Structures are given as C-alpha cells and as structure tokens.
A protein has these predicted regions:
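Bacterial Sec-dependent N-terminal signal peptides
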Residues: 2-6, 10, 14-48, 115-135
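N-terminal capping/linker segments that flank leucine-rich repeat
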Residues: 29-35, 49-50, 55-60, 77-79, ...
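Surface-exposed binding patches on compact interaction domains or structured appendages
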Residues: 39-44, 57-90
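A short beta-strand micro-motif common to beta-rich folds, especially ectodomain repeats
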Residues: 97-112
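Conserved hydrophobic beta-strand positions in leucine-rich repeat
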Residues: 169-172, 199-201, 218-222, 241-243, ...
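Canonical leucine-rich repeat
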Residues: 187-190, 209-211, 230, 251, ...
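Leucine-rich repeat
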Residues: 193-195, 214-217, 235-238, 256-259, ...
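Consensus "Asn ladder" position of solenoid repeat domains
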Residues: 204, 225, 246, 267, ...
Length: 505
C-alpha cells in the first residue's frame, strides 16, 4: 500500500505531466522569452503547522516545477532549515501563557516569474488550544486522566465543549491504591475547565499552581505537593483553600473576598495579607517562616493558628468573633487582646512577652503562656478558666487562683513565687508548682486532685490526707519533715527524698 508521501508525490507528478507542453508536433509558435510567463506549480504537504508546547521539529514537503525556490523565515522563535524534500521547522519549549504564531514565505522562481505561498506556523502554550479548537495539557499524566474521563466522543482529544461540562476534578494521588499511579507534575491547561467548582490535586508533584481567574472555583485542595507559588487571584467564589505541606513562598489572593477556610501549615511563607476578608472563618499558617501577617478586620474569623513562625507582633483589631488564638513559638514581645471579648483559648507560650493583660477576655477558658518573660499577669475576674499554665516566667510574690473555681489544671512552676492560693479551686485535678519559693500548700479542699508536682520548693509540711484521688505526688528537693496521708491511701507515683517522713491518719 502506498504511504501518504508517495500518494502526494504521485499526485504532483500527474499535475506536472498535465502542465508539460505537448511534443506531438503541433507545438504553438515560439513566443519571445521575455513575453512568456512561466506556469509555476508550488505545493506543500501542509500549509498549516502546529508545534506542541514542549517544542520539537516539524518537516514540511515542498514540491515545485520552478527552476529554484527559497524561503523567508519571519518567525523569531523558530529556526528553519532547508532539507532535501522541503524545510524543517524547529522550536524550543513555549513557556509563555499564550500560543505564538508566525509565517514562513516560500518563493519559487523561473526566469522572471515568481510565485509565493505562505506556511502558517503556530506553537501552542502549555495548556492552550490548538488551531482546531482542541485543548492541550503540559503534563501527559494529567492529559491521560482527562481524556480517559471526559473525552466523550472518543476522538482522542478534549474539546472545549467536553471540558465545559466538568465541575469536579479529583486528581488526588492515592498512595494506598493497589493500582500503580503516576504523579501529576503540571496542571497547565486546567483553565480550560471554565465551569470547574471543586479541585483536589493533593499528593502529586506540582511545583506551581495558577488558577487565577477561575471564577466558579469554590474548593481547592493542593496539599502535599512541592508548590512554591499559588495564584488564585480573581477566584471570586473561592471558599476553601488547603495547601499545607508544600514549599509555598507566595499565595496571591486578590479578589478572593468569599474565602472562608485558609489552611497552609508547613510552607515557606514570610509574609501574607489576609486583612479585610469578610467571610474568613478559619486561618492556619503554623510552621511557616512568617515575619509579617495581616488579618485584621475579618469580622467572622474564629480561629487563627500561627504557631512556630518568626512573628514579632500581631495586629488583633477588628476580630470580634475570634475565640482561638495560637501564636506560640514566635518572637512576639507584646499582645493587645483588649478587643477579643469572645476569646476562649490563648496559646502564646515560648515568646518574649513581658506582661499579659487578660482583664477584657472574660470568656477565656484555656491559657498557655509558659516560657515567656512575664513579670505581670492580669487575669481579671474571669470565672471561665479551666486551664492556666504560666510556668517558666518571671512572676514573683503571691499568685491567687482561688476565685477561678472552674480551674482543672494549673501550671505555675519555674517562677519566683512565694505563695500560691488554690484553696477554693475545688475542681482542680492537676497542680504543678515545682521550682518555686513556696513554703506551704493548702490542698485539703481539693478532693478532685489527681496530680501534684511540687519538686524543688521550700515545703516542710504537707498534708494530702484529704486528696484520696491522688495518683501522682512529687515532692523531691524540699526540706520535707512531714507528709501526712490518709490511712489506706495508695499513691501510684509517689516521689519524696525520705519516705520516713510519711505518716498516716
């Protein structure tokens, strides 16, 4: 069977024969050469060339009966060479966001007669559209997936019409699957899914993600990739963005005013502006490299998780709904919490805070502010406290917890405290006051107490006979002369320097 090239050559040969002057003796009278125009035939096997985004070489066959022919390359991004059968067009990868086009002019000459024809050349962008209107994709794995799922007419290409019906794309790499799966390395071409609402591309090998202008997107999960830059600007309906466990240094959010959930822990962000997001509810940027973050004037924000960064300050204005603030393990020197009337949990441990005023936070239940420089701690009249850990600070003198009757856990060790009043904390189950200057502890009313750690204090007499639920009691490093327990009282984890000081009643 003849191949296409042979068929093309045979057709041209036929044309050439038909155009050849007759040799039967009935030749027309000779015409002067300068008056006789040559009949030039100039044919290509294709007048339109499409080069894929990754680049490559395309050969075009040129057949002519002219005495000579040449070409003019008007394309700056492609190289053209003449071959024995025509021309060879070479282009490198198209890294731009749009298709690029150009023309090559073929000029055939016989005597004074010239014939010109143009070859149109187009190189598609990664994720662009071919001259036939079909969609292209940079990553062959991504392309194979969409073709297997959405090439409804089975022609081996994805049309714009086929892409338009897609609202959900689940591209998550499931490592638990028994079937072998290849990771997707690029989502260039995804913008062709103009009606996409939900996208899950987690667990792949993406290095960048450009979803800008995809106005119908509401949900994106691109976690567990290697993404350094995320662009969702112009995604005006985006509500959920999950991008944790990446390498992101930049997230573009312009126009995302409906954003509700923003979770991007363990990335490389150094700054970000989330201020004035009227619908934002949940913010999690733990374990980044943040030195600056703006999230003021977010009236619906309830949770801000910002631990393990490099923050030195926080602007907490315009956050009336905030009830959980985690800003531990930073370099923060002060916190103004005066506008956070609904705050219930504050985790600000391991910072450089010198004083903390909680008098405006009457709903606060959990406070962990250990490992700071706090010399002044104002707890106010809050009766909602269930946990306070202010250990390893610079507190001194007496601390009175007695009015916080709902307290279940207290940690105040590692301070210069001389007196701790917990006499009315009847719900208390755990008290840790080790390494202080406390000389006595009154715990007889604490019948719910299960753990008491008071190592390295100045306690000489201790009566725990009324604390029948105690399972842990540490009193090492004290000048203890008497420890009174109830008859039959058994403490599973009991540590004292001299067990002879124990008596029972």
């Amino acid at each position: 069977m003849m191949n296409l090239k042979n068929i093309f050559l045979a057709a041209l040969a036929t044309v050439a024969v038909l155009l050849t002057p007759s040799c039967n003796g009935n030749e027309p009278a000779n015409t002067p050469e300068d008056e006789k125009p040559a009949d030039i035939n100039l044919l290509f096997n294709t007048p339109e060339v499409v080069i894929p985004a990754e680049g490559g070489v395309v050969d075009v066959m040129v057949v002519t009966n002219a005495e000579s022919w040449d070409f003019v390359n008007a394309i700056s991004w492609a190289e053209v060479e003449r071959t024995s059968e025509g021309i060879s067009i070479y282009a490198t990868e198209n890294t731009s966001d749009s298709n690029r086009k150009g023309d090559i002019l073929i000029i055939a000459t016989t005597g004074k007669t010239v014939k010109e024809r143009t070859i149109s050349v187009e190189q598609v962008a990664a994720g662009g559209t071919t001259v036939g209107g079909n969609l292209t994709f940079e990553c062959p794995v991504f392309e194979a997936f969409v073709l297997s799922s959405y090439d409804y007419n089975g022609d081996g290409v994805l049309s714009a019409e086929e892409a338009a019906v897609v609202t959900d794309l689940n591209l998550m790499l499931d490592e638990t699957s028994e079937e072998e799966q290849e990771p997707i390395t690029s989502l260039k071409g995804i913008k062709n899914f103009v009606n996409l609402v939900n996208l899950d591309c987690s667990g792949n090998l993406l290095t960048s993600l450009d979803l800008s202008g995809m106005e119908k997107l509401e949900y994106v999960d691109c976690s567990y990739n290697n993404i350094t830059k995320i662009d969702v600007s112009g995604c005006k309906n985006l509500k959920w963005l999950y991008f944790y466990m990446n390498k992101a240094t930049s997230v573009l959010l312009e126009g995302c005013n409906n954003l509700m959930f923003f979770q991007g822990w363990r990335n490389n962000l150094t700054s970000i502006d989330l201020s004035n997001k009227p619908e934002l509810i949940y913010l999690d940027l733990m374990m980044n490299s943040l030195r600056d973050i703006k999230f003021e004037n977010c009236p619906k924000l309830q949770v801000a998780a910002l631990g393990s960064n490099n923050l030195i300050s926080l602007n907490l204005k315009g956050l009336p709904s905030l009830y959980t603030l985690g800003c531990y393990d930073n370099n923060i020197a002060s916190l103004d919490l005066s506008e956070l009337a609904n705050l219930e949990m504050l985790e600000c441990y391991t910072n450089n805070i010198a004083s903390l005023d909680l008098t405006a936070n009457k709903k606060l239940k959990t406070l962990t502010c250990q490992n700071n420089l706090i010399a002044e701690l104002k707890l106010g009249d809050n009766t909602a406290f269930t946990k306070i850990d202010c250990s390893s600070n610079r507190l001194s003198g007496e601390v009175d917890f007695s009015k916080f009757t709902a307290l279940k856990t207290i940690g105040c060790g590692g301070n210069d405290l001389t007196s701790i009043n917990v006499s009315a904390c009847t719900a208390l189950t755990a008290l840790s006051c080790e390494n202080t200057k406390v000389t006595a502890l009154e715990v007889s009313a604490l019948t719910a107490l299960e753990e008491l750690v008071a190592n390295d204090c100045l306690i000489s007499v201790m009566d725990c006979s009324n604390n029948r639920k105690l399972s842990k009691l540490h009193l090492q490093g004290n000048p203890l002369t008497s420890l009174v327990l109830a008859s039959g009282q058994s403490i599973y984890d009991l540590k004292v320097d001299n067990y002879d000081v124990i008596s029972y009643k």
